[in-house]
Amino acid sequence: MTNAKEKKKIVLWLIVLAILAAAAFTVTAIVRHNQRPAWDGGYSVHISEVMTDNKTCPNGEGVLCDWIEIENTSSKDFSIGGYYLSDETGKGKYCFPAGTVVPARGYLVVWCSPDEEGDYAPFALRKAGGETVCLMNENRAVLDSAVTAACRSGQSLVRGSDGALIPA
């Protein structure tokens, strides 16, 4: 009987340890999510994800085109009107319209196509990678940039822990 009691104690302790480990992982994930990435240059807005060969995510008009996601890591809305986005360093190819806001701890997706009319960034991204995507302030000073990488059709690129864009 002692053996059965000891086995029950061991099983009970293993369950308790598993619950504690899961709770510790959850708390760690929450804390890390709310921290700013080390590579963000001290700005609360940065390029967080890029799609260079979109075959899976149509925009509200049903168009499949490249897109760039801007993330705001701060607890306040960020007015991005007058800022620029480009696929070339120093060239502000797309100017965010006045009144454009990236919500607090939120995202803004910019659709990119030189062929579409309306509110599109007027450039496409190379599918093969090696292109620098830049977010610039109203004076065209670079706040964030990232070099695209080659990836499969329909696969997005996300920022790795070192800030590089890597296949998701």
Report each predicted region and the residues it spans.
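Activation on beta-sandwich/Ig-like modules and their edge loops
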Residues: 2-168
